[in-house]
Amino acid sequence: MNQVKMVLIFAILLFLSCVNVSAQVIKGRVTDSTTNEALSYAAVEIRSFEDDVYIGGSSTNEKGEFEFHLKGRYPKIRITVSFLGYKTIQKVYAPATEYSYLKFEMQEDSQTLNEVVVKGLSPAEKVQRLAYNVSLVETAKLKSTTMDLSNVIDKISGVKIRSTGGVGSEANVTLNGFSGRHVKIFIDGVPMDGMSSAFGLNNIPVGLAKRVEVYKGVVPIELGGDALGGAINIVTDNSRCTRVNASYSFGSFNTHKTNVYAEHTTKKGFYVSLNAYQNYSDNDYKVNIDSYTKFNEDGSNQEVKENLTVRRFHAKYHNEVAILKIGIVDKTFADRLLLGFMGGYEYKQTQNASTMDWVYGARYTTANTLMPQLTYEKRFKVLKGLHVSLNGNYNFGKSYSADTASCNYNWLGQSQPKGVPGELSYMKYRYRDHNGAANFRMALFPADGQSVSLSSTLTTFSRSGKDETAYKPTYEHPSQSMKIVTGLSYKYDYKGKWNTSAFVKHYMNHLEAYLDPEGGINYQDFSNTTSYWGGGWASTYFWGRHTQLRLSYEYALRLPTSRELFGSGDDIERGNSNLKPESSNNVNISVTANAVDLTDHRLTIDAAFQYREIKDYIRRTTNNDSGRASSQNDGRVRNLGTDLSIRYTFKDAFFVGGNFSYIDMRSLTRYVTGTQQESKNYKERVPAIPYMSVSYTHLRAHE
């Protein structure tokens, strides 16, 4: 392993030494076209010409001068200069050298003297002006860090990420009371369902993303998944420039993390990018236990109740991932046409079951990922501004779960022989988890301020395999599922002052498996297809220059995931093919207030309220006799929540913010199923859900 690390570090250094990326410097001066006097504090904004990506914004100094240092190279840029009482100027410029000096002569415009001049919006600001309750983080200042996406998302108000262990463990996202599979994760609008933990939020480096969008509650149809409790969309970085970022870190428990990102776009529109990262850790940190199994010399054992601090001894994890994309941009037939390939390997030792009462010392799993990808985008200048996009991938992955030890382990790292092999269940299970996802979107703009959008998302899952230790019919017969979620929406925007969207969604779920529908051993081919309708609306109103109000409602559904239906594959989590979809009435109210343009200071306050009432809530349970987990429908649940976020920025050089969230999630199932006996959980809080959180964030320019 040490040799592999040294080779990897050497390869990174060699790669960086062979790449020369120069920054472009853009300087300029803004003057009055009549008097030639300098115009101080004029707003200057730079965007890439090809994809309208926001690059930077500033204002002129007392001499009317501005200066930008562009990170990377851009074939063409669009510069916009605006100033109160003058006509806005836009120039498209192709920097021919590393240094450019531009002059802007502005003409007076008496019609704008009494109007408000609004600067061009960055992509982040455009998303935040939507009618949906959305929080957004841009990652430009974090590219060269070793942070992962979970570190970034965890700082957003109303969001809490809890990990089940160290490096490689599952990241459980809690969003306004909803957690786990109730919160959908997307990459460029494509669901991440079925991907291994190598592509989990706590393993993906922040450099992979351009920004992260967190939708709290109602989710737009463009994210065509069955999200009930909200959604997180990771927007990858596909800007047209040449750059390289690399990072390496090491830490406690022999933890090593490496990330390399490089991309290049030629003048003829050929694009190539490579993102490679690895994570390794022994994960041998200490944990607190209140009991353990004592092994006696005569072969007997006994449960000892004692509070101890012990070190984990079987939790090693490592993964290696490479993502290559090649294609063309800015052609007559495609704005972007990219073919991608994602390859990865993962090794994970299993220290304990779903609870810490069951300890393992030899179980492990491996997973290989081979995933081709396709991206296509085109904005048509005719046909009423038609915009079409397609994103898809398919994973030809293979996994292996091994449980062969003929002994039991305790938290002291001691072992005791047993008569039969298998710590939980004897297995050498080789299986194929093939999952695919595709998202098609089309938008049409028939008139100013109006748009019609269509989105359809397909996700498929297929598992088949063989256990080398014994014939198990449910393993060798394929288990398959297919979901199609289609949405249609209409949006109306009234002069940028008020906009509203109405949408309808259709959900289809098809399931095939070899099982006993009653949970016994009378196996048979089982097939079931269901379909449902949902819909809602979202509206936002801008009150004055600095206040935005949002109100939205949705009748939403969440279809059971492949893991909830078929299990995890390693026998730690059992499937339940009888699960029914969850349905919910969602209401969201939020307000955003900005105190801006106060010299060099900016203060932003976000406050939101959410109401959910869920039917057939899917809850994860654990069997105390085996440590296995499974899912079941649990009647009705009501959730009330609120969150508050306050952020202060000084000159774009210093940022500090605080977040507070509170939720009240309670069971409304009055009677025990099939009886008239009142449930002891009626109107009680749903267990294992954090109901209050407080966090803060600060960032200085050099960070």
Question: Language model features by range: what are they?
Answer:
Residues 31-35, 42-47, 80-87, 98-141:
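Short, acidic, small-residue-rich periplasmic hinge/interaction motif at the N-terminus
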